[in-house]
């Protein structure tokens, strides 16, 4: 894939830090069933003021067009998750157990300390591969922090199936088995300790299984698809491997109690951030992907710019390439702008890591421009000084109420 899937809304592209993931290989656990697969309520009526991030945003001129087929498909998942959260929130307030009762339940199901160990291991993985985000999770409540770690690990393991050291051995059948494991853990039958942590998470938060299934579908695409004819096609791929993460994690991170935004609009912003981050991955890694025989750019827009696949493989920066890249970067920034509107409506303890990630990732686009659009042989990155400056600024911005 262009740069690996997102592992959490605020820690996109887990593979960028390098390293192997052998310590997350599956192993058996002895966990008893915990819950039935959640069935979301009926979809709510669409609100006139909440529309999904536009796949139809033109690269050269940001005019809004009619909603595309990919947007329609993704929007149904957004509505489904938003409905699940809205239906669960009042019930959660009424039935929430005291912490000591939750701990007794954890011990009853997994045995003394096993679930705690599972979450701790997830935290160790997050700390190793997503240091900045891990730091931000320390501001969250313990329950939310552990849940985000569990989601991160599942996403990273999923990404490693097609981007890891054993990727050449992965088949569609293997991904089918992985999806069956996902269904099992949602039904309370985890296969190993990492699955157990996620199984516990989805029993406590109104998380829908569909975004997880959609991420697996993104992995399936990477087994056979290496070209995207239109941005509509690419948008759907970006949703599968990155936009899904926002839908997974917002139910855990929570929406600010004093927010006036609709649940649906906050999920649209989460989706936009995933799309923006994956587009940034793609634009950063054009040369790397080309060396693997892959092009994650809309071929019709390349043709409109007077460029061909051979121009990508040749890797020479020209006037045509600069003009093309300016349009692609402009579109990614539009998605970042859409995402930033929603971050301020997250729960106050969750805003900082998300906002910091957004600001840092958006600066990669600046770095591509600073490299004179040479993303063939130069890798754009954000220097340590800029990172250190962005973190306190993001913290200050996150402290402002929506």
Curated annotation (Swiss-Prot):
The family database entries (CDD domains) matched by this protein are listed as: Trans_IPPS_HH (cd00683)
What are the recorded GO MF terms, alphabetically? 15-cis-phytoene synthase activity; geranylgeranyl diphosphate synthase activity; squalene synthase [NAD(P)H] activity
Cellular-component GO terms for this entry: plastoglobule
Where found?
Answer: Plastid, Chloroplast, Plastoglobule
SUPFAM superfamilies in the record, alphabetically? Terpenoid synthases
**Top-level class of the enzyme under EC nomenclature:** transferase
Q: Keyword annotations for this protein?
A: Carotenoid biosynthesis, Chloroplast, Isoprene biosynthesis, Plastid, Transferase, Transit peptide
Q: Which InterPro entries match?
A: Isoprenoid_synthase_dom_sf (IPR008949), Squ/phyt_synthse (IPR002060), Squalene/phytoene_synthase_CS (IPR019845), Trans_IPPS_bact-type (IPR044843), Trans_IPPS_HH (IPR033904)
Q: Where is the composition biased (Basic residues)?
A: 20-35
EC number(s) stated in the UniProt entry for this protein: 2.5.1.32
Q: Which domain of life is it from?
A: Eukaryota
Q: Which reaction does it catalyse?
A: 2 (2E,6E,10E)-geranylgeranyl diphosphate = 15-cis-phytoene + 2 diphosphate
Q: In which tissues is it expressed?
A: Expressed in leaves and endosperm.
Q: What does this protein do?
A: Catalyzes the conversion of geranylgeranyl diphosphate to phytoene. Mediates the first committed step in carotenoid biosynthesis.
Report what the protein is called.
Phytoene synthase 2, chloroplastic
| Species | Zea mays (Maize)
Show the taxonomic lineage. Answer: Eukaryota, Viridiplantae, Streptophyta, Embryophyta, Tracheophyta
